Amino acid sequence: EDIAFGPMNLGLSYDEVEKRVEDALKMVGMENYEDKTPHHLSGGQQKRIAIAGIIAMKPELMILDEPTAGLDPDGVEKVLNIMNQLNEEGMTLIISSHDIDMISKYADKIFVLYNGEIIESGNKNKIFSDMELLKKAHLRTPITTEILYNLKESGLNVNTEKISVKDTCAEIIKAKQINE
């Protein structure tokens, strides 16, 4: 019922609404929960049902506020997989989050807000390698950035704009080989 609410208000046929609800539930891995009431679901299941309600509307854009907040690791992984699949299918996602690890993995472009104002925008390497900016915005520095800054302060010539673990490891190996 909750998932069908939006599509029904679009004036779609009963069959189209049913198909959209079925497809949305399947996408979020909740196809056997169509008759459950929300208060009988876990927090992660409730989030996935809420996302299914949006998916059933077939929007071009989805705005999510802290989509992984309060979820256990399994719930986080499920929600991130759904978001990734939606993005791969062409949906634009706007995510508001303090989860630096999630944002550094999934975001293409980042806007940093402070006191309601955009104070910086750019790609994740630019944003997450700027420790002063992160401090000003009260955001946690990614562990990879901290490692690279510590190595740089120790005298290693490393590029602090590497964010992924894979790129950070490659940068450390490269710097170690140069210093040998």
For each feature predicted by the language model, list its residue ranges:
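Conserved ABC ATPase "signature" region
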Residues: M8, D15-N32
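Conserved ABC ATPase signature
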Residues: T37-L41, Q45
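Conserved catalytic motifs of ABC-family nucleotide-binding domains
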Residues: K58
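Catalytic Walker B motif of ABC-type/P-loop ATPase nucleotide-binding domains
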Residues: M62-D65
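H-loop/switch region of ABC-family ATPase nucleotide-binding domains
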Residues: S97-H98
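ABC ATPase "signature
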Residues: S121-G122
